[in-house]
Each structure stands twice: as C-alpha cells, then as structure tokens.
C-alpha cells in the first residue's frame, strides 16, 4: 500500500509540474521546460534531418569543372518543385520539425518571445525552405528573426542567409550591399560567420562578373573557414578566377593550396587542381619530362580510378602538344572507354579525334567523329 501511495504522489507531482509549464505563463519553470523540449527533441531531430539532406546534396552534386564552380551547391535553378513536392524528404522533415517547435513551444507573452529557442526554429525553417528552392518562403523566416529577435545570437546568420536568398532571387546588388554592411560590423562576427559572408559576397560579385572583387572575398572565405571541404572548394574557385583573368601563375599557386590539403578535402578538388595546372603548362619553357611523370603517376594511382577519363584526356593533350599523334589518339580513345559521367569531356574527346583526322585529310573518318 505504501508503494502505491508513493507512486500516486510521484504522478501528482509530475502533473503539477506539467500544468505549471503553461506556454502562457512567464515563469522560470515554463521557459526552461519549453526551451529544453524544443532544443533536445523537436529541433534536434529537425537539425539532424537538415544536415542529412544537405550532406546528400553536396555528395550527389555533379560539379562542372569546365566552368567556375558555384560557391554553394543547389539543385538546378531551372527545376521548380510541384506544390507539396520536396527536393529531398529530409528538408521537408526539417521544416515540419521547425514548425512543430514554433507551434508547440513558442511563448509569446505581451508581444515578447520568452522561449530562447524559437529563433533557432525560425533559422531551421528558413534553411530548410532555402534548400528546398522555396526562396520567398525562406525569406519570410529570416525576416521574422531580424524583425522580432534583434538580440538573437542568430542575427548574423539570419543576415547572411537573407543575402544568400536575395542572390537566388536575382537581387544581387541588394545582397552585396547588405553583406558589406554586415562585414563592417566585423567585431560582432565570429570567424565562420565572417567566412560565410565573404563567400557569399564572392558569389554575388561572380554573378555580376566583377571577378577582381570576387577574388578579394573568396580569399578571405578560404582563409577563415574552419571547414576543409569549403577551404578546398574556395581555393579551387580562386584559382579558376585567376585563370579567367589570365593570371595563370597566381591560379597555379591556389591550385597548389588545394593539392596541399590532400585528404583533408575531397579528392575531386585535388585531381582537378592538377588538371588545371597541367592546362596552364608552357610547352616551350616547361619541363616536359616532369609533366609526363606527373601524368603517369596520376594515371597509375588506384585512388584516381574515378577520374581516369579526365586524366587520360589530359595525357592525350600532352601527346598532341609534343607531336606524338598516335599516342594522342590512343589516349583520347582510352578516355572515351573510361565511360565517366562527364558528357562534355566525351564530346571533347570525339572533337579532338575529329580534328586530328581532318588535319590528316581523313575527312570521312573526321565526319564520323564530328
């Protein structure tokens, strides 16, 4: 009987606590109950779903290394999801968890939000919508934080994500102006926030074709980011920008930084950094034997099997430049046989084979390749 009485007392105490945790009461117990519940249950699950979706997007994104890479990866801007359709189910789950946290744990009393986790929920809401390509709805969430949570720890991130969203909505000049204003508050930004803002400024300037300005900010982003995947990507983009303005030596210096990261950054950046350096090779003054050894090492490295198509294409270009056409033909065909995912590269292989045959007056064979 005593045990039953004790159990009953415990239940009564728990019920009293739960009743006391009203969303309409501005009490310490209520605030902390709803903050903890939002943080360690709903928001935690939402963040997990968001990270899974973003990681899957980054992993599955097919970069076009023939053009300047985008700062961040999103699905094609030409793809518009149908109503109720999500780019990735993980982003839909993240959005649902954010909405649930806001609906169940918001404690707006006398016009003031008392639950310190609700701004986190709005950030998650905006990010999930952003990656789901619903940019206007994402903008609503970031604007809500900026309007109603001026003392939030997420203010800098909300401003950065708002600018990112403005860029996606083709309001690039507005985004650039707001990011410059944010960077003027440098003392208020932590290192990663500064890196993120600088990266998006670089993206804005690339869209505006102001490559000199983009170079300034991609350098800051590459130096400051704590994420090695981003560091490798940003230094690679910086190399591409220098190549684009004809500064090949400066481009190569940045490709070397990508190569030096080695396993700390995805291998695709390192391989393409080598490839771009090889394209910048001066066949009149450069050490051709050393270049041959580099290409041989790249081809024979088992870890480079996913990249054999581009390595063999570059080997073919080497042979073509040193006048060994038979070897060039063999390597263009090897590149085609590797059957990589880069269809543009395959077209370059066929075009090169067509050109070689055309130059040798083999017009019928050339026509077949064209």
Regions found by a protein language model. Give the residues of each.
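Bacterial N-terminal signal peptides that target proteins for export
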Residues: 1-9
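Acidic, polar-rich low-complexity tracts and alpha-helical solenoid repeat scaffolds
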Residues: 20-370
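Hydrophobic h-region of N-terminal signal peptides that target proteins for export
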Residues: 13-21
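Sequence-pattern detector for short linear motifs
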Residues: 9-10, 229
């Amino acid at each position: 009987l005593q045990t039953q009485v004790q159990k009953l007392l415990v239940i009564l105490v728990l019920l009293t606590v739960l009743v006391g945790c009203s969303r309409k009461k501005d009490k310490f117990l209520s605030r902390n109950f709803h903050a903890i519940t939002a943080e360690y249950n709903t928001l935690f699950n939402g963040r997990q779903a968001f990270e899974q979706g973003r990681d899957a997007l980054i992993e599955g994104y097919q970069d076009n290394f023939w053009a300047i890479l985008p700062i961040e990866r999103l699905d094609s801007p030409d793809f518009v999801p149908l109503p109720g359709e999500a780019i990735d189910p993980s982003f839909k789950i993240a959005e649902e968890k954010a909405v649930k946290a806001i609906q169940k744990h918001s404690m707006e009393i006398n016009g003031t939000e008392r639950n310190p986790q609700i701004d986190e929920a709005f950030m998650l809401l905006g990010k999930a919508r952003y990656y789901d390509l619903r940019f206007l709805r994402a903008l609503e969430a970031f604007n809500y934080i900026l309007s109603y949570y001026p003392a939030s720890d997420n203010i800098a991130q909300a401003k950065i994500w708002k600018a990112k969203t403005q860029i996606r909505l083709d309001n690039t000049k507005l985004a650039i102006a707001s990011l410059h204003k944010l960077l003027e508050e440098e003392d208020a930004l932590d290192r990663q926030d500064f890196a993120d803002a600088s990266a998006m400024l670089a993206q804005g300037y690339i869209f505006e074709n102001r490559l000199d300005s983009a170079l300034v900010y991609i350098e800051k982003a590459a130096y400051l980011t704590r994420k090695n995947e981003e560091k490798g990507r940003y230094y690679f983009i910086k190399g591409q920008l220098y190549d684009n303005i004809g500064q090949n030596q400066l481009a190569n210096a940045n490709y070397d930084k990508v190569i030096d990261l080695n396993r700390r950054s995805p291998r695709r950046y390192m391989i393409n950094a080598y490839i771009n350096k090889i394209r910048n090779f001066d066949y009149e003054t450069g050490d051709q034997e050393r270049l041959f050894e580099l290409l041989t090492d790249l081809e024979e490295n088992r870890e480079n099997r996913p990249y054999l198509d581009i390595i063999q294409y570059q080997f073919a270009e080497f042979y073509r430049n040193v006048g060994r056409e038979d070897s060039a033909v063999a390597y263009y065909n090897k590149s085609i046989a590797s059957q990589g995912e880069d269809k543009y590269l395959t077209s370059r292989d066929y075009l090169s084979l067509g050109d070689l045959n055309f130059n040798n007056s083999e017009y019928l064979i050339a026509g077949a390749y064209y």
